[in-house]
Amino acid sequence: MSGRRRKTGIYGYPSVKQPKVTQKHRNCGCAGTGASAVSVPRRKMETAMIFTTRDLDILRFLRWCRFVLAEDLTSAFYKAEVQNLEILRLIKLYQPAQAYTMTAAGNRLLDAAFPKLPAAVAPAYKAADTLRRIRQAKLMTTAYQAGVSVFTTDVSALCEQAMFLPMIARNRGSNPWGSTRVAALLHTGNLMCAIHWVSPGIGCVALTDELTAFQNHTASIPAKQRAMIFAASSYEEILSELDTVQEKQNTRLQTYREVYDCLKLPLFLMPCNDTGCLQLRILSIPNYRELLARIILKSHYAPPPAGRPMYDALYQGVPFVMAADMDLRRIDAAVEAARSDGISQIALAALPEQVEAVLNRRYRETGKARVFTITDAALRELLGSTAPYAPPDLPFYTSEGGVLDVPPLKAP
């Protein structure tokens, strides 16, 4: 690419005529990431729109999830980037759900860029199907902004730090996941996590089937600890479902409250927002609890006593728990252990939204704990930066070193 390349944006309506382009560099097989556009000088002073890695990431989001809420897509990418692709008729807004979906033209472009992607499947416009896809997209955008590799097509990708959506496998004729309700699998740090969407009215789950599928599909993947994550749009949604008393018609199934009470694996609560993004980044750091405890307590840090794995440190003789992972059952275990040790209150630290939405009410106001907020400075010391991941705003290059420009795509 020439050093004279200049950035350009496309603004207008779909009826606006696009610049004339040539066929050169149009077809490709490549790897890359996704978004806005740049132009390069052409003979006769023609200008062509060049797709960037950010553009291609937007299109891949829609291939994986089929529907992404407009507000979620524009939280991960610039609004102008999304509008550019809409103007080019590569994506369109499904008005009833206020969610973007891919057009036939967008699918053709994506197939040219990534020949080995999951096959395009026409979106189902039933409300329940659309809602399920939107929830998957919320999980995916949260992980994406945490720097997790999300565009995976097989569970083997979890040998590295990545997220895999089982719904991708369910679209290939066979269904190795059966009727399990797992929304995503995540390998981050030393953890292998099964993520379930838990919000009001979500229903019941066959826990034995879930755990069997989780173990069978990830047995060959190295991870020191397996865990489960309950996710939703907010902590309030998760806790609302967990606190609801339900009558069951099928004794083989468990409510998510029953899963919460009986699960032997670590269990984290996570919202699909900026706090959830930070939470995932913290989980990606091996030994994050001790590291954060040392950063926060500084010279006041003292190691926890033997036989108290639910403590992360002692702070002036008081049990200290690092609660940024939102393992509430571990906090409750620390409270009980402290009382058995003759200590009436523990100390815990967490992210601001966690403190305000959950921990103050459950622990500070009930006298169970002193609750501290983790500062940005402490997070920067652990993570380097608290800013969410943003893909590079660079041209998308094919495996042959060419670029993708605007092809004369047919109207969808």
Where are these regions (language model features)?
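Electrostatic, structured charged patches in enzyme active sites and in nucleic-acid/phosphate-binding
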Residues: 137-412
